[in-house]
């Protein structure tokens, strides 16, 4: 288990080095869910995620001579930036091994914090193996992303901050990847507030802790592509799993469309930009994955490092999940005014056209016909059915596109 004193010591070390992130009460989500909802905004942390807490606590706990040969880690995301920033802050050289498929913006961000970036391997596991080999050859310190007591203790300072600001908290929902974040937070909270309900949330695309708890031992699961790439971990840590098993009340799963909808909801209602991994606690609440909740409830928004190019895709998926986006294919007679008449009928159905594409050159079209692809803004699933029924009722052949 993780000693509570390690978290207290981490809090002392980090107090002036990391941001004490805001704990925000949300009136909108409190009314929607029927309980007081608060967000712990680690998306506003330095480097944009909680990972700096664990990385910096690990490094500042080492004797200076142990850091002389630098630090090494493997990561394709937030941990890379946390290690790079922490090393730069302490004047320590850092090397980060990243898979060759890592998006360029993450590579640039890590380099901007002063790290040497080595792109190697087809996936994280191959990059990790290369990092371990380099660490053994150089004698540098390896900073594990989650399965180290000092790293867990650093993440646990989030729990102390929540208790200091909201001592009567009743529930806390925490994302789970490798388990370092929830292990630290659970240890911090259970020490003085054993009655608090602690709930872990995973993506169904990487349910490693969920299935490990079901089996009663650590199991490795296949991981599929997910919006919550920051928690897409094949198995929990050797050190984190026993803490999750003993201190966490339950672990629930959320689906991809639910994550997308939560990202959009946070952006619209709180003006907070959160990455997929950070949105899973709210996704769990919005989709009633947790039952019988009462009292003040905290969602840990673990990070906000979402790829700019991904935002538009996520927003579109979130709008689809909320019934606020509809894409149609409609075949028209290739005659003057046909497109205008279609637009008029769409207006009659109270939908708003956002994008329209007119194609009369497709080989699949009969002579004298044209095809229109239309993207519409709608007001929910009931409105979508009204739009489709109206268009069909006036004679259009409508194909709903996914």
Curated annotation (Swiss-Prot):
Pfam families in the record: PALP
What enzyme category does the UniProt record give? lyase
- What InterPro entries does the record tag this protein with? ACT-like_dom_sf, ACT_dom, ACT_ThrD-II-like, Ser/Thr_Dehydratase, Ser/Thr_deHydtase_PyrdxlP-BS, Thr_deHydtase_catblc, TrpB-like_PALP, TrpB-like_PALP_sf
- Give all N6-(pyridoxal phosphate)lysine modified positions: 51
A GO molecular function assigned to this protein is:
pyridoxal phosphate binding
Q: What are the names of the required cofactors?
A: pyridoxal 5'-phosphate
Instruction: Give the keywords, sorted.
Output: Amino-acid biosynthesis, Branched-chain amino acid biosynthesis, Isoleucine biosynthesis, Lyase, Pyridoxal phosphate
Gene3D superfamilies recorded for this chain?
A: 3.30.70.260, 3.40.50.1100
Domain of life of the organism encoding this protein: Bacteria
Instruction: Summarize the record's disruption phenotype note.
Output: Cells lacking this gene show undetectable threonine ammonia-lyase and serine ammonia-lyase activities. They are capable of growth in the absence of isoleucine, whereas mutants lacking both tdcB and the citramalate synthase cimA are auxotrophs for isoleucine.
Name the residues that bind pyridoxal 5'-phosphate: 78, 178-181, 302
What transmembrane ranges does the database entry give? none
Q: Which residues belong to any copy of the ACT domain?
A: 327-402
Q: Which GO terms describe its biological process?
A: isoleucine biosynthetic process; L-serine catabolic process; threonine catabolic process
Q: Which reaction does it catalyse?
A: L-threonine = 2-oxobutanoate + NH4(+); L-serine = pyruvate + NH4(+)
Q: What pathway is this protein a component of?
A: Amino-acid biosynthesis; L-isoleucine biosynthesis; 2-oxobutanoate from L-threonine: step 1/1
- Coiled-coil residue windows: none
| Enzyme Commission identifier(s) | 4.3.1.19, 4.3.1.17
Q: Which family does it belong to?
A: Belongs to the serine/threonine dehydratase family.
What does this protein do, in the record's words?
A: Catalyzes the conversion of threonine to 2-oxobutanoate and ammonia. Functions in the threonine-dependent pathway of isoleucine biosynthesis, which is the minor pathway for isoleucine biosynthesis in G.sulfurreducens. Also displays serine ammonia-lyase activity, yielding pyruvate from L-serine.
Give the protein's recorded name.
Answer: L-threonine ammonia-lyase
Source species of the chain:
Geobacter sulfurreducens (strain ATCC 51573 / DSM 12127 / PCA)
